[in-house]
Amino acid sequence: MNIKNTGKIFAVLGGLTALTVLSSEIFYDFSINTKSPIHMSKLNNLVQKATNTSGSEEEASAKYSGLTGTPEMKKWYAEHGEDVYITSDSLRLHGKKFKNDGSKYVIVCHGYTSKAKHMAGFVNKFHSFGYNVLAVDARAHGDSEGTKIGMGWPDRFDVIEWIKLILSWDANAQIILHGVSMGAATVLMASGEVLPKNVKAVIADCGYTSEWDEFRLEAKNLHIPWFPVLNAASVLSKLRDGYDFKQASALEQVKKSSIPTLFIHGTEDELVPYCMLDELYTAANCEKECLTVKGAGHALSSSVAPELYWNTVENFIAKYITE
């Protein structure tokens, strides 16, 4: 091999390396960095395509009414919530507290790029069951501080801080953790940590197995070759945030959990594939139940089959909560 050909090979390799680094930076900013100009603008189109929710805001609101709530529920949410705050990982995080009688509590965790107020339907329903409800804005969402979306991994420790806040209000609190999408992954990741005995059950609605698995699917949706872009973006996450995409694993956390868990998933979920339900359910070593909602897309189980959804939830938590 002559020097000229060797130079060409190194030039090609250098170009490929530079392209990989640039692509990984773009992928990281698009997926995680909320301050990036490419984050929100591209994300909305991806979510609409994956969940088939393109159209007017009214149409989307009606489709997700089980999650976001009716206009009356949204009004009730706005009028009755009390702002509360914690500090976790040097970030000031925001939540809304909805008081009720007794010592039953539920922490409600929203999904990717959403916010607590978009969970008004769930908040209202749990409150009608007699629960004190704490709806929280995840880091880098809503009124919480932060610029990096944690995909549930650092957020699991934020949940523990919210639990501590509840226990400062009520030492006898019986606590349910409920999450949808990224919120489901968050509560599953939290369940693998050592939690106070006050935490009685977990409800995970359409949670993903790991950040790696979910971003690999996202790369596919964006027609990006996941290798080596995802690998490089994962290294960036390790350098900047202290963990890589494979570390952020709900699948590994549920193996350590002893908290009774209800797994919920729609069969037509394309954003977090239905097959992830089987993986999570099989891996969990705790008491567990599973609800499959036929025909439901991502985060739509409560909208498609509200009676089935809430009867299942109510019957499940009744096993672990004392009146």
Regions found by a protein language model. Give the residues of each.
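Short beta-strand/loop motif that positions the catalytic acidic residue
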Residues: K256-S258, F263-H265, D269
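Hydrolase active-site cap/lid region
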Residues: M189-Y243
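Catalytic nucleophile-loop/oxyanion-hole region of alpha/beta-hydrolase
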Residues: H141-D170, Q174
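Catalytic histidine neighborhood in serine/cysteine hydrolases
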Residues: Y281-A299, T312
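An N-terminal hydrophobic leader/cap segment in hydrolases
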Residues: I9-T87
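Short alpha-helix in the alpha/beta-hydrolase fold that links the catalytic acid
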Residues: A250, I259, P273-T282
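Conserved alpha/beta-hydrolase
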Residues: V123-E145
